[in-house]
């Protein structure tokens, strides 16, 4: 991915850190290296314990999973922060990833059903592969499905945990939270699938769900969510219904079931 002495080739280093993130010690930069664009992700050591723990967990996940020969992991590099000349005052590690596009960024109006099917199928295949390796992603959202060189990749593994030992603390984005998480249940394969269902529903319907508070999100997910799709993509309703069941026992139990549903009902 990068030359060994890449640090001396960094150009146009630009901070894209949100103020709220900076307050918690999290920093993001974009840069160019040999005419290719990259993201640099960094956590200030000892600034905020939870953020640091999550970041270190993500670094370890990258180190561990690279030996599994998966096709949904971006090429990456982890380096000491002080090897980057512009960041020599920083301690700790930096995660470097290539710049990517949003996998679900395209308007469905410009795509035929076969293109939409392939987009959804690729995302479900990646989720299936992650789960089959024994992991829950734990932070499924639209921006964590990326396109690089026309292929799908997953990113942001800070909340990724082994299925056998999920987090006891539910730390999730309310927009994507399965109903059971609002009641204190641990994350699971099925909460990943519910979150993916929300990603898919917003993309297929071309609208964003709206809520003003954590309580409002809880009411929406636990009581009020009603799937309404344009006629042009009604073929995907059975898939969404299985992903977005409010009762966990009625939801798909794994991503393989979702793929089977997609195949059966798409007629493509």
Model-found features: residue ranges?
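ATP-binding glycine-rich loop module of kinase domains
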Residues: 24-60
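Conserved HxN/HPN-centered segment at the entrance to the catalytic loop
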Residues: 66-85
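Conserved short submotifs of the Hanks-type protein kinase catalytic core
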Residues: 86-103
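Activation segment signature within eukaryotic-like protein kinase domains
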Residues: 119-120
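Catalytic-loop of the protein kinase fold
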Residues: 131-147
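Conserved activation segment of eukaryotic-like protein kinases, specifically the C-terminal portion
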Residues: 167-181
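Conserved catalytic-loop aspartate of Hanks-type protein kinases
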Residues: 192
């Amino acid at each position: 991915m990068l030359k060994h002495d890449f640090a001396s080739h960094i150009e146009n280093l630009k901070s894209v850190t949100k103020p709220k993130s900076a307050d918690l010690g999290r920093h993001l930069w974009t840069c160019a290296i040999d005419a290719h664009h990259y993201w640099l992700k960094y956590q200030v050591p000892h600034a905020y314990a939870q953020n640091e723990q999550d970041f270190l967990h993500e670094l370890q996940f990258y180190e561990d999973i690279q030996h599994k020969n998966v096709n949904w992991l971006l090429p990456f590099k982890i380096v000491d922060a002080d090897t980057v000349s512009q960041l020599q005052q920083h301690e700790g590690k930096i995660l470097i990833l290539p710049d990517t596009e949003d996998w679900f960024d395209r308007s469905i109006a410009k795509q035929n059903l076969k293109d939409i099917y392939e987009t959804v199928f690729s995302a479900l295949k990646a989720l299936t592969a992650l789960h089959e390796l024994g992991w829950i992603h734990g932070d499924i959202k639209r921006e964590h499905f990326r396109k690089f060189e026309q292929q799908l990749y997953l990113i942001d593994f800070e909340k990724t945990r082994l299925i056998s030992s999920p987090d006891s603390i539910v730390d999730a984005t309310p927009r994507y939270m399965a109903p059971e998480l609002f009641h204190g249940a641990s994350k699971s394969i099925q909460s990943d699938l519910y979150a993916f269902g929300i990603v898919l529903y917003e993309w297929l319907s071309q609208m964003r769900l709206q809520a003003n508070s954590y309580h409002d999100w809880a009411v929406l997910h636990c009581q009020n969510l009603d799937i309404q799709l344009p006629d042009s993509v009604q073929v995907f309703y059975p898939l969404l219904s299985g992903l977005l069941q409010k009762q966990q026992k009625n939801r798909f139990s794994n991503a393989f079931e979702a793929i089977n549903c997609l195949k059966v009902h798409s007629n493509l």
